[in-house]
C-alpha cells in the first residue's frame, strides 16, 4: 500500500499550483472602545491553501467618546480552504505590521499583530463578498491594546 501511495504523492507534488490574486475594498465596525466605522483595502496573492495579503485600514477618532483614531498597515498570512465549499472559501489569518493611534494631541506609532478569520462568498464571476473578523494586539502604549474589527467588503479575484 505504501509503495502505491509514493508515486501518487510524488505526482501531486510535481503538479504546478495555480496562483491567484485578489483585491478587497471594505467597510466595517471597530468595537473598541465604542462602535465606529472602519474603512480599508487589501491586496493579496495565494496558491492553493496558503495566501498572503497587505492590508490598510482606518478608523477615525471620536473625541466626545474618547475613542482614538487607528490606522493599521498589516502584512498577513492566510490558510484557506483549497476550493470553495457551497460557493464559500473559509480562511484563517494572522500577521503583523505597524499601527498609528491618535486622540487629539496624543499619538502612538508602534508594532501590532492580528489574528482572525472569515469567508469569501462567490457572487458572480470573479466578484465575491468578503466577511472578516480580526483581533489586534498593539504593542507600546496605545489607549486600547486589543481592538477588534468586523467588516464586509467586495472582493475581486483575478
Predicted regions and their residues:
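Extracytoplasmic loops and strand-loop junctions of Gram-negative outer membrane beta-barrel proteins
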Residues: 24-26, 99-101, 137
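Solvent-exposed loop/turn segments connecting transmembrane beta-strands
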Residues: 29-39, 62-69, 103-108, 139-147
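Bacterial N-terminal signal peptides that target proteins for export
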Residues: 1-7
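Short strand-turn segments of transmembrane beta-barrel domains in outer membranes
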Residues: 27-30, 74
